[in-house]
Amino acid sequence: MQSEAELRSLLSRIDHRGYPDYKDTKGQYRFPGYVLSIDHVQGDPFASPSKVSVLVSGKTAGFPQELYCGKCQRIALQDELLRQFGRRAERFAFKAKGSGKSGLISVSRCGQEVLERTACQIQPENGNILLRMEIGFPANGRTINARELEKILFDFVPECVKASLFYKNLDAKRLRRIVDLAEDQEYIRKELPKRGLCVFVANGSVLPRESGISSRPMRDGIAFQSPTEQEVTLELPHKGKITGMGIRKGITLIVGGGYHGKSTLLKALELGVYNHIAGDGREYVITDATAVKLRAEDGRSIQKTDISMFINDLPNGKDTTSFCTEDASGSTSQAANVIEGIEAGTSLFLIDEDTSATNFMIRDELMQRVIHREMEPITPFIERIRELYENYGISTVIVAGSSGAYFHIADSIIQMDRYVPKDITVLAKKEAENFPQISVPEQLAKKPAYDRVPRPDQAFHGNDRIKMKTMGKESVMINRDTIDLRYLEQITDSEQVAALGYCVRYAQKHLIDGKKNLIQIVDELEEVMQNKSLAELCESTSSVSCMAVPRRQEIFACLDRYRALRLG
């Protein structure tokens, strides 16, 4: 390891040389209070910025252990330190001049959700803090401008580090509040199954968002108020008593007129699988962590999935116990999404009729009379929903605005009336008595088989070069194959997409052997991320600055949508 003086001398030596000579700076340098590591140097001022990291020892950082002793506390603290560093870095961005990306200083941009990221990691055993950033090494044309880089590395970065990664320079009360909030959120999440709940929405929550392109809370948004019949009070470790709506396990229907807030509530439930920052409005909207948003997904590929619970006797004779297609219809895609959700270990399905295949969700009495059951290959979801709960322990929350078919079988019915929820279970059930109930098959569906094994001929070996590119939250490309993730609505950050790409790549290089099935492969991927780190999925330190931990459910979904992965 070299000293900061040696780095300064090196920069002076390479000043005004050709840009490739910046490669000589790669290495570690000891600065007062931390170690600076130049992990990867860009080859051109217009290329992706250089990867730089700082390591602050736990003793120097000085954070009390109780702020990072548990996983939820550690993730919350990492998130806050990253935000603090990012705000400081923005003040210095492009103050060092030059061509291309010269002077850029950036870290991961955190949204409203609190995610575990590779950009800031605290080692729980000793409190060491590793923070990764990107820096555009300055140039004049394609000539090194070392004096400007010296400003960044010797003035700007040290100020950011000291202001955001040293406990003595931060607001201790604010940090305590952030960690306390994370502990309260984790407490609610653990309390849900004990109380027979799958969702909790606190009174006073603000669910509407600022706009379609902003996840910040709507200014003057109507505060949530639970129906009296569904109110639950919890005693949190730090906040104390909190009251809100508890959605019980089973079948819950959310109804109401258009624009009255049904989908807004469901959207909040979708993202309630994550913790949210203070001031978001959804801090105490907590959903079962395994919840999966279901929808139709026309055109997706399906490989060796047993959809016979819902679809049988296709006119083309296709086997639905091991169904394959490169262009799924709305109903077959939604059926596959249900089965894959069960395989991924979900305990809660979230469904909006607006994005569902109608023929998959319901089949009314008139249609059943005209098109007899033996002529219809689809068993609609309404006929299996109770079975899913009683035999698989999977609850369902459905948003409906056009069909009352689910009134008969719902355990709870909530009406959104001008953004205010009302419990109308008794009223709706009484009205439903005047309408025929959809018949349910007497025979239970055969339990789907989950023994899909990726073929090893699709694995990468040795030094095979693998190119990977992410396109926001939409997709990830591995070599020439694009994995379409547009309809995985619980992906909340592009860095989760990057992590999913690395999960696929790691599985292909290290886990796919023709023996392990998908469940075993995902188990091992989770083990790597939990027991080692997310960064372990990468092949070099130059690749680990932009990932956020994905859920198990999204890892499964990504593998299921990877057309190049052949399952046996």
Q: Whereabouts are the PLM-identified features?
A:
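Flexible beta-alpha connector loops of hexameric P-loop NTPases
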Residues: R300, F310-S331, R363-I378
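Glycine-rich phosphate-binding P-loop
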Residues: I242-Y274
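N-terminal accessory targeting/assembly segments
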Residues: M1-Y187, L192-G196, L207, Y562, ...
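Carboxylate/His-rich catalytic cores and anion/metal-binding grooves
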Residues: P193-V199, N203, Y259, L266-E297, ...
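Phosphate-binding/switch loop-helix module in NTP-utilizing enzymes
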Residues: S322-S356
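Conserved NTP phosphate-binding and transfer environment spanning the P-loop NTPase/kinase superfamily
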Residues: E387-G393, V399-G568
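Conserved P-loop NTPase nucleotide-binding/switch module
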Residues: I342-I385, Y389, S402-H408, S412-K429
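N-terminal pre-Walker A segment at the start of P-loop NTPase domains
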Residues: P208-T243, A278, I286-A291, R295-I302, ...
